[in-house]
Every structure is written in structure tokens, then in C-alpha cells.
UniProtKB/Swiss-Prot annotation:
Quaternary assembly: The complex is composed of two ATP-binding proteins (ZnuC), two transmembrane proteins (ZnuB) and a solute-binding protein (ZnuA).
Protein name stated in the entry: Zinc import ATP-binding protein ZnuC
Ranges for domain ABC transporter: 11-226
GO biological process: one example: response to zinc ion
Task of the protein: Part of the ABC transporter complex ZnuABC involved in zinc import. Responsible for energy coupling to the transport system.
Entry EC number(s): 7.2.2.20
Organism name: Pasteurella multocida (strain Pm70)
InterPro entries found in the cross-reference section: AAA+_ATPase (IPR003593), ABC_transporter-like_ATP-bd (IPR003439), ABC_transporter-like_CS (IPR017871), Metal_Ion_Import_ABC (IPR050153), P-loop_NTPase (IPR027417)
Localization, UniProt: Cell inner membrane
Domain of life the protein comes from: Bacteria
Length: 263
């Protein structure tokens, strides 16, 4: 059965907890990814966004909880950054060919889809930030994934190139008919196309569709009202709340006068 024929989940994360040296990095995370969906993860620095991606990518085992993968799942991953050894120059084509089991035609197709065929003989070390991100995206789609995981995909890209890169990501998603899970701080650009937004600060503080977020104070408290009309969320009950810096500002026993969160 083809993975897109019915709406079976691609990945399910159930009650994921991650603890580092008795400090909770993730707490009770539940997330289900379906075919063709676009989910954007936002949250303060140190809130656990990258940790969540590592758990999903099997780079980090959760302390507790379960990750369930569809048996035909293929994941493509674009990291936030990649370390290049400038003493060992390598061309774009050679870099892409390092991925096992990939044909030259698949490499050419990926470069063509991202409009960077002209870069195939260029040295990886001499690429601009935008060119490098396109190459990393090309590498991620070589196996024609049905889930594309992007960690800050516009890292190192100037502001003029960010909107163009996001448009390219959307076009790639449509061409491959894949789902996207993306960590991003460029909320004013990505929110228009995302199906769901998750705001994470160790736990899921808020989540939902972009159309229903406009006046919710929780998201505004984190990111400001300039993004509010593009993001949706729900609020949930727990025994603490966070201020704009991610610190606990009030509990069920003590309500800070400055806290704008709702029970």
C-alpha cells in the first residue's frame, strides 16, 4: 500500500520525555505527523526544539516515551549548519554522491528541482549561505522523502534570500508530496504556509492552526503581536507558566501580576 493512499500517520511521538543530568529538556511531548502536512516548531532558545528533532531522527533516545514510525517512512534532513573542512575541498556533485545508493540521475534531478544545476562543479567551501542551504536541501531530497525535517533552514541566508528559500521549500514539498516538520524563527515568512504551529518550551505550551491564533495572549507573550494574526494555538493546564524569556513566572499557588498566561 502506498504511504499516501490513506491518511495514516508518518510518525507518532507519544509522551516523550528527555532528561539531561536531572534537568528536563522535553516533558510529555505528543505529536503526530501526517502526509502532506507542514508543521512549524517555534519557541525560546533552549526550549527543546532541536532536542525534539534529534529524538524523531533517532539521534537521541528519549528518557521515556515512544516514537512510532510508518514502515515505509523515508526521512530527509536539513541540519541547522554543517562543518566543512576547508583543507579538503569538495565539489557539490561529489558531496551529494557521498550518500549511499544514490544515482547520478537522482543528483541531477535534485539539483534541477532546486535550480542549482549550474553549481554541480563548484567547491562547497566557496558557496554563499543561500547556495549552501539549497545544496543541503538537495541532499535531503535525494531519497525522495515523504517527511522532510528542517532545522532553521535559512541559517546563514541574508534576509533577501529567506523568502525565496521558503518558497522553494514549499515548491519542493508540492513536487515530492511530502510532509514537512520545520524549526524556524522566521515566523512572519513561514506562518502563511504552515498547517500547524507548535510552541515548545520543554513542553508544548501552545499549538494549533494559523487561522485561529490571532488574539491568544500566550503566543503573543512569546513573540509579540506582529505575528499573532498568522498563528494559532491552544492553551492547556499545567502547574506552571513561563515569561517571555522562558523562565517560570507563576504557578498554581502563586499568580504573578505580570503573567499574561491563562489557565
Amino acid at each position: 500500500m502506498h504511504i499516501h493512499s490513506i491518511k495514516l500517520p508518518l510518525v507518532e511521538l507519544k509522551n516523550i520525555n528527555v532528561v539531561f543530568e536531572q534537568k528536563k529538556a522535553l516533558q510529555n511531548i505528543n505529536l503526530t505527523l501526517y502526509p502532506n502536512s507542514i508543521i512549524t516548531i517555534v519557541g525560546p532558545n533552549g526550549g527543546g526544539k532541536s532536542t525534539l528533532l534529534k529524538v524523531l531522527l533517532k539521534l537521541l533516545p528519549p528518557t521515556s516515551g515512544q516514537v512510532i514510525y510508518h514502515k515505509n517512512l523515508r526521512i530527509g534532513y536539513v541540519p541547522q549548519k554543517i562543518h566543512l573542512d576547508h583543507s579538503l575541498p569538495i565539489t557539490v556533485e561529489r558531496f551529494l554522491s557521498l550518500k549511499k545508493g544514490i544515482s547520478r540521475q537522482a543528483i541531477q534531478d535534485a539539483l534541477s528541482l532546486l535550480s542549482i544545476s549550474h553549481l554541480h562543479k563548484n567547491s562547497l567551501q566557496k558557496l554563499s549561505g543561500g547556495e549552501m542551504q539549497r545544496v543541503l536541501l538537495a541532499r535531503a531530497i535525494l531519497n525522495k522523502p515523504n517527511l522532510l525535517v528542517l532545522d532553521e533552514p535559512t541559517q546563514g541566508v541574508d534576509i533577501n534570500g529567506q523568502a525565496e528559500l521558503y518558497q522553494l521549500i514549499q515548491q519542493t514539498q508540492q513536487q515530492l508530496n511530502c510532509a514537512i516538520l520545520m524549526v524556524s524563527h522566521d515566523l512572519n515568512i513561514v506562518m502563511a504556509d504552515t498547517n500547524e504551529v507548535l510552541c515548545i518550551n520543554q513542553h508544548i505550551c501552545c499549538a494549533g492552526t494559523p487561522e485561529t491564533v490571532s488574539n491568544d495572549p500566550t503566543f503573543i507573550h512569546f513573540f509579540g503581536d506582529q505575528f499573532a494574526k498568522n498563528v494559532a494555538l491552544y492553551t492547556h493546564k499545567h502547574n506552571h507558566k513561563h515569561d517571555i524569556h522562558g523562565d517560570i513566572c507563576c504557578t498554581s499557588d502563586f499568580q504573578s501580576q505580570q503573567c499574561t498566561h491563562k489557565e
